[in-house]
């Protein structure tokens, strides 16, 4: 009986160690990929998903901006509206480049800085709003929020999707647009609130277009 109790006690201890080891400095329990919380830097997170981020990693290094993502730079917490590898590869094809490093360093730095906010910004922090084309290259912003990026300014807003024919009964969608490019079209976030220890990633849709920024 004593041996059995000892075994049970050890099992409980192991479970407790696992639970506490999964907790991060933000006080949440890391559930891994399923809930978008990762107890690692943003830079380390990118390396766990080569399909979506391998070209992004190369672009960041080529632009000399790695320190923004690994926590060693000026900002310890950022929000990155992440352009994925597929968007980058399409840009290569459209512009006759063979490799990410063929893109001018200045261009890489410019587009990345326009997609980085120097603070942690969650989906829940962005108010409801809209941005509508009101003729030609003119867009009108409704509610939402203006947000300074490392370069330029963004307009952010959320709205509720319809669900099974019921208006505004679905999930919350995050959108953004550049306030620096006349006639820039709206961009949609495909996956929100990917949390890391150095900030938050909101992954842009695969059809993201460089020209809008």
Segments the model singles out, each with a brief description of its role:
Residues 1-23:
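Sec-dependent bacterial lipoprotein signal peptides
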């Amino acid at each position: 009986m004593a041996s059995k109790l000892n075994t049970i006690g050890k099992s409980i201890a192991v479970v407790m160690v696992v639970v506490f080891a999964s907790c991060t400095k933000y006080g949440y329990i890391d559930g891994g990929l399923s809930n978008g919380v990762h107890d690692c830097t943003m830079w380390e997170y990118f390396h766990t998903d080569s399909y979506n981020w391998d070209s992004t990693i190369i672009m960041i290094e080529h632009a000399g901006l790695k320190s923004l993502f690994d926590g060693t730079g000026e900002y310890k917490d950022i929000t990155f509206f992440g352009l994925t590898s597929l968007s980058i590869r399409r840009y290569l094809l459209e512009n006759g480049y063979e490799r990410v490093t063929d893109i001018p360093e200045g261009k890489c730095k410019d587009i990345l800085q326009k997609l980085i906010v120097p603070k942690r910004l969650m989906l829940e922090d962005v108010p409801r709003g809209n941005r509508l084309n009101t003729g030609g290259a003119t867009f009108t912003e409704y509610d939402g929020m203006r947000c300074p990026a490392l370069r330029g300014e963004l307009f952010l807003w959320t709205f509720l999707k319809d669900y099974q024919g019921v208006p505004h009964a679905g999930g919350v969608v995050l959108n953004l647009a550049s306030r620096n490019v006349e006639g820039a079209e709206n961009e949609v976030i495909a996956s929100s609130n990917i949390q890391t220890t150095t900030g938050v990633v909101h992954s842009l849709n695969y059809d993201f277009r460089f020209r809008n920024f």
